[in-house]
């Protein structure tokens, strides 16, 4: 718009309201497949399967729902349970009244967060305490789309654990732990 792209001290930055929102877009925790790939494209699914060491048949051949579609699914009674990870949907969603109404309709809400005091966590039927940034190893992507490495510098309090460990434990409990069998760290 101003003609300053590519000049020193300038650039296009994603201004978002959530921590690591850029990472969530790049690594597809919403409606797309890893790295901007498409669930509907067999070649993309094969590529992601190879990169992540996951059997191709474990990757869905249809798109998942975007955030607004998830909330609509809850409002329509099609979605009965939700697992919310590291975000406060009740407070930060564009239409918080709609988000709160949808969250209140759920039969089962799981919230995995480092704060049990958020509006969303207060509604949870099950709260999974999560480790904070200095209590786990990991990566993040900043608004300049640069990757950063987070080193663990202290132990998480109480029963809190890294998201990665929570995912692995729940996957094992659900009987699909083999999907994570080759993954030994979140990197």
Residue ranges, per PLM feature:
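Non-catalytic alpha/beta scaffold blocks inside enzyme catalytic domains
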Residues: 1-11, 15-187
